[in-house]
A protein has these predicted regions:
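Acidic catalytic motifs of isoprenoid enzymes
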Residues: 1-118, 125, 129-168, 176-189, ...
């Protein structure tokens, strides 16, 4: 049991194991890299202070999961490059997120590694494309980088239809990989997320 900062009067129950510890470590890696990226872009000393706070944990995770940390670091570097070069190849750009998430979801090298990488790859591409679609109007106004802007210029009439088909295709591949995994606990909840929940931002 633990005390939630938002609801301090009531004890909460948490189930913790090696898998939840791994998820927490991966979240910290991503948070650390995002803070570092914000510090580079904004020169925010608040972000830099948070990076310093997380330094020790980041080093610990790096020694424990070098493959995953290397994948996230490579992703951040490549993403910076494609944005700087104003890359318009949507598949290439979205694939960077897919490759990174594939490595993060692949906790261990075992018989399910390839399937988890495939699941993460298509989930990552879906997430990138969904974010790009959601931010499209704002990015266009601010003239910020977004590979969908060039696509819309090339085929304005079919733009929304194409985006929907692309997102559906990514999630279909993701769902196929999910169904091949031996998931028994909370499978229905996860299916609900994959088949319905992920579309909430689009709709």
């Amino acid at each position: 049991e633990f005390t939630c900062p938002l609801h301090p009067t009531k004890k909460r129950t948490a189930f913790m194991n090696e898998a939840t510890d791994y998820a927490a470590d991966m979240n910290l890696i991503l948070a650390y890299q995002n803070l570092l990226d914000d510090w580079k872009d904004e020169k925010s000393y608040t972000k830099k202070a948070f990076v310093k706070i997380l330094d020790k944990d980041y080093t610990r995770i790096m020694s424990k999961y070098p493959r995953q940390v290397a994948a996230v670091e490579a992703f951040m570097k490549k993403t910076e490059e494609v944005e700087k070069n104003n890359e318009t190849n949507l598949d290439l750009v979205a694939g960077l997120t897919g490759e990174m998430l594939g490595e993060v979801l692949c906790w261990r090298e075992d018989e399910w590694s390839d399937e988890l990488r495939t699941l993460g790859f298509y989930m990552g591409k879906f997430i990138y494309l969904m974010d790009a679609y959601e931010d499209y109007e704002e990015d266009r106004k601010k003239k910020s980088y977004n590979p969908l802007i060039q696509m819309e210029k090339e085929n304005e009439q079919e733009f929304n239809t194409f985006c929907r088909l692309l997102l559906t295709s990514m999630m279909s591949e993701c769902a196929r990989s999910f169904e091949r995994l031996p998931i028994l606990l909370h499978a229905d909840i996860l299916r609900n997320i994959l088949y319905s929940g992920v579309w909430s931002r689009y709709e």
